[in-house]
Amino acid sequence: MLKVSAVLCVCAAAWCSQSLAAAAAVAAAGGRSDGGNFLDDKQWLTTISQYDKEVGQWNKFRDEVEDDYFRTWSPGKPFDQALDPAKDPCLKMKCSRHKVCIAQDSQTAVCISHRRLTHRMKEAGVDHRQWRGPILSTCKQCPVVYPSPVCGSDGHTYSFQCKLEYQACVLGKQISVKCEGHCPCPSDKPTSTSRNVKRACSDLEFREVANRLRDWFKALHESGSQNKKTKTLLRPERSRFDTSILPICKDSLGWMFNRLDTNYDLLLDQSELRSIYLDKNEQCTKAFFNSCDTYKDSLISNNEWCYCFQRQQDPPCQTELSNIQKRQGVKKLLGQYIPLCDEDGYYKPTQCHGSVGQCWCVDRYGNEVMGSRINGVADCAIDFEISGDFASGDFHEWTDDEDDEDDIMNDEDEIEDDDEDEGDDDDGGDDHDVYI
């Protein structure tokens, strides 16, 4: 009996000590009991409220990841809502109805409470109203379907159209489908749905390619003329050249042909043409040059090159005549050279300038035949389109810079002596310059 009483006394003493400790804790807390609820523990609240102004304020929407996000977020760091939509991690995360998903990067997303977000944005001096639309909106989540990529007007590729619409809803922006498939969109949309079937390019597309290349060649030509560079003049064997097949076009087209012809064989092979295939999305560039190869030998001669570009433009004589008429207006200017055109809009073989009393021979594109200019009527019965023996004439647009680079066949002595070449090139006394 005495042993039982002793045990009861020990238990009572232990219970009394626990009660006294609890009473002391209540007194330290201002006389208010927490009833055993850890949410009212000020020490715990202080730990989780380290980003709040007042100690002990509990945020029922608090999230550890969310607090870590705000710890590193600064007013100068925007909320990354403009990540690549196809890799948006928020598309795979579902937040509670009181929170919104914010993407930190392409792999990390956090759920942030509306209350915490508004509070932090106020502290940062950001007007939360500008975020209320895209952040607080209820955007429809996309189902899991087989990918059917589309390119949006914002330049991003979306796995399917629903994700494009979802991203537009989240950002509060207007995003439309620019084209089907991955970005960037091709300049010309294929008419065939099969990727294995090559689309044939139309004549209009060939003309557009020719015009773009011609403008590009002209810009390069003018830039090269303005910025003359010192270079080493290469002198290949004279026997390698056939002067009867020189380029018939003496403008930027002929200039570009000579720049591409790196082995000086007066032919362009695929390796020399490859530098022009710059835009992989331009499907008709390679097809255009394939159409230039009339002999189907995988080589483009200088005549094929010139004719290929010239046939893709409006009739040259009619174009020049129209331009002259536009400049003159109603009154005809005295002394103005007026080209003679055939019924198809190309140049007649014989051209004359009445004011100076001279006539000369040209091909159908207006390229003057070397040595054909005389006082009086010229005899132009030769088929000059295939003779290749053309001079510059009134249509010569090459500069002295090209003379220094390309005049390599004037005299055999020039080939043997490079130093003598430089002096001869600067001497304008040679009336028989031939351009390569």
Curated annotation (Swiss-Prot):
> For the Kazal-like domain, which residue ranges apply?
133-185
Predominantly, its location class is: secreted
Q: Where does this one sit in the cell?
A: Secreted, Extracellular space, Extracellular matrix
Q: Where is this region: Disordered?
A: 393-436
Where does tissue-level expression of this protein occur? Expressed in brain.
Lineage of the species this protein comes from: Eukaryota, Metazoa, Chordata, Craniata, Vertebrata
Q: Which SUPFAM superfamilies match?
A: EF-hand (SSF47473), Kazal-type serine protease inhibitors (SSF100895), Thyroglobulin type-1 domain (SSF57610)
Q: Where is the composition biased (Acidic residues)?
A: 399-430
PROSITE patterns hit by this protein: KAZAL_2, THYROGLOBULIN_1_1, THYROGLOBULIN_1_2
Q: Extract the InterPro entries matched here.
A: EF-hand-dom_pair, Kazal_dom, Kazal_dom_sf, SPARC/Testican_Ca-bd-dom, Thyroglobulin_1, Thyroglobulin_1_sf
Which is one Gene Ontology cellular component term of this protein?
Answer: extracellular matrix
* Protein's GO biological process: negative regulation of cell motility; negative regulation of endopeptidase activity
Which positions form S-S bridges?
C90-C101, C95-C111, C139-C169, C142-C162, C151-C183, C317-C341, C352-C359, C361-C380
Q: Molecular function terms in GO for this entry?
A: calcium ion binding; collagen binding; extracellular matrix binding; glycosaminoglycan binding; metalloendopeptidase inhibitor activity
Q: Which gene encodes it?
A: SPOCK3
Residues annotated as glycosylated are S387, S392
**Function statement:** May participate in diverse steps of neurogenesis. Inhibits the processing of pro-matrix metalloproteinase 2 (MMP-2) by MT1-MMP and MT3-MMP. May interfere with tumor invasion.
Going by the UniProt record, its keywords in alphabetical order are: Calcium, Disulfide bond, Extracellular matrix, Glycoprotein, Heparan sulfate, Metalloenzyme inhibitor, Metalloprotease inhibitor, Protease inhibitor, Proteoglycan, Secreted, Signal
Protein name in the entry: Testican-3
Thyroglobulin type-1 domain location, by residue?
314-380
